[in-house]
A protein has these predicted regions:
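N-terminal beta1-alpha1 cap of cysteine-dependent amidohydrolase-like domains
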Residues: 1-100, 104-122, 128-136, 197, ...
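C-terminal and late-domain segments of enzyme folds
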Residues: 144-280
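A short, compositionally biased
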Residues: 136-138, 183
Length: 280
């Protein structure tokens, strides 16, 4: 069987590529870290940098171009100008795209999200400065929409993940937010400990996102963007309460070494979808 191939973008301030690459490999993918310039210059020449040979494209977290002109703006411009047509072809071929934190900001600036009516050019939503005016680094509870078409969150109802950003507030017009909810494109909302949406309350909603929106997808469910970091929860010891989890595992005589974090479920869903679709 051929492997499920994932491409993780690197370069110019993207700094979560190693853990994202690791998470994809844990999920069963053949993952490659590829510099943006290599991808742009290497089309068709080397299978390790030829986008058409991959099934999953990852815009990871970090601070691309130091967030100059706004988070994800320069990265989106460079991608759109140089390989925008290849990205659109990648999407038309039924492949998967995920944007995490800075990657989500880039997808929004590219117009790939929300992709209303199949339009992957128009920018219609934004991720802007946190209400606090400060960079945040904490963990959040997420409520996952059970009706969403998002392929990455299949079988997940709630999940805890870390967030670390300065421009994570989801903002859009009332009309566009209503459209997102009507089409079930709102994938994840910040939630309280009871699993209910945070209703804008801090710290459960850490940035002031309208309607507690933490992640959205396009109408097909194959393009997903979220501010929290699933790759940041690749092992149970990543969690701030890991010592309590360790005590429970030891009591149940379960393996500690191989007990992965819940964030891997998002990547595994992607790998399993591609495996089934392409029979790889």
């Amino acid at each position: 069987m051929s492997p499920v191939r994932a491409l993780v973008l690197t370069g110019y301030g993207l700094n979560c590529d190693y853990e994202t690459d690791y998470a994809l490999k844990l999920a069963g993918a053949e993952s490659h870290r590829v510099h943006i310039n290599e991808l742009i210059s290497g089309q068709g020449s080397n299978p390790d940098v030829d986008l058409s040979t991959f099934h999953i494209l990852v815009f990871g977290g970090g601070f691309a171009w130091a967030d100059d002109h706004g988070a994800g703006v320069v990265l989106a411009s460079k991608i759109k100008f140089n390989i925008g047509e290849q990205i659109e072809r990648f999407i038309r071929d039924g492949k998967l795209v995920i944007g995490i934190c800075n990657g989500f900001q880039s997808l929004v600036n590219l117009g790939l999200l929300p992709g209303f009516r199949g339009d992957y050019q128009e920018r219609s939503v934004a991720l802007t400065y946190n209400d606090s005016g400060n960079f945040i680094d904490t963990w959040v509870n997420l409520k996952i929409n059970p009706e969403t078409p998002c392929l990455f969150t299949k079988g997940i109802s709630h999940i805890e993940l870390p967030v670390r950003h300065g421009e994570g507030k989801f903002y859009a017009s009332t009309e566009d937010i209503e459209s997102l909810f009507e089409s079930n494109q709102v994938v994840a909302q910040y939630a309280n400990e009871d699993g209910n949406p945070a209703s804008g309350q801090w710290p459960e909603n850490p940035n002031g996102s309208l309607e507690d929106i933490a992640g959205i997808c396009d109408p097909t469910g194959r393009i997903f963007g979220l501010m929290p970091h699933p790759e940041g929860f690749n092992h149970f010891t990543n969690h701030p309460n890991w010592t309590e989890k360790k005590r429970i595992l030891e009591k149940e005589r379960k393996s500690i070494k191989n007990h992965e974090g819940d964030g891997i479920r998002i990547f595994r869903n992607a790998v399993e979808y591609i495996s089934e679709r392409y029979k790889v």
